[in-house]
Amino acid sequence: MKNIVLTGFMATGKTTVGKKVATTMSFGFIDTDKMIEKMANMTVSDIFEKYGENYFRKLEKAAVKKAARLKNFVIATGGGVVLNPSNIVQLRKNGVVICFVARPEIILRNIGKNKDRPLLMVDNPEEKIRQLLKEREPFYRFADYTIDVSDMTIDEVAEEVIKAYIRLKKG
């Protein structure tokens, strides 16, 4: 069976929903950011701080390559995984790519006081979210299916992911 690949902006519920979907479908679950942290033996924030975004993206590419080889997995990706088109090509080989989108104020609310978001360590995080969303929006269009999670519960999103997967894996 094909993998279920969850993409989308940070704090849209990819990991939380991914774990729920994996349990429901009896799939494995993997988070590419956690893979990167294991590879580097440090947090994503520390990687950004110590080595910068370019180094992080190299590690991310390696993690995606590894994750894409798996079968029967839900793969939650980092918010910027779409910035490298080869990542999406890799993930699509054996996966259905589902993108989560949300309004900026929902993303900001979900992030809350979480300090583990290196790209948002700025004076005006909501403005930064809007800017990043605008930059990434064209890349998110490469998904097989998009879900606006803004007004949905975790259970509703998980159900929508499963329905979309069942429809799309046939194609």
From Swiss-Prot:
InterPro entries linked: P-loop_NTPase (IPR027417), Shikimate/glucono_kinase (IPR031322), Shikimate_kinase/TSH1 (IPR000623), Shikimate_kinase_CS (IPR023000)
Pfam family name, one: SKI
Protein residues bound to substrate: 33, 57, 79, 136
Keyword Nucleotidyltransferase attributed: no
Entry keyword set: Amino-acid biosynthesis, Aromatic amino acid biosynthesis, ATP-binding, Cytoplasm, Kinase, Magnesium, Metal-binding, Nucleotide-binding, Transferase
Reaction equations catalysed: shikimate + ATP = 3-phosphoshikimate + ADP + H(+)
Gene3D superfamilies membership: P-loop containing nucleotide triphosphate hydrolases
Obligatory cofactor(s): Mg(2+)
CDD domains reported in the protein's UniProt record: SK
Family: Belongs to the shikimate kinase family.
Oligomer and partners: Monomer.
Function: Catalyzes the specific phosphorylation of the 3-hydroxyl group of shikimic acid using ATP as a cosubstrate.
Stated name of the protein: Shikimate kinase
Gene: aroK
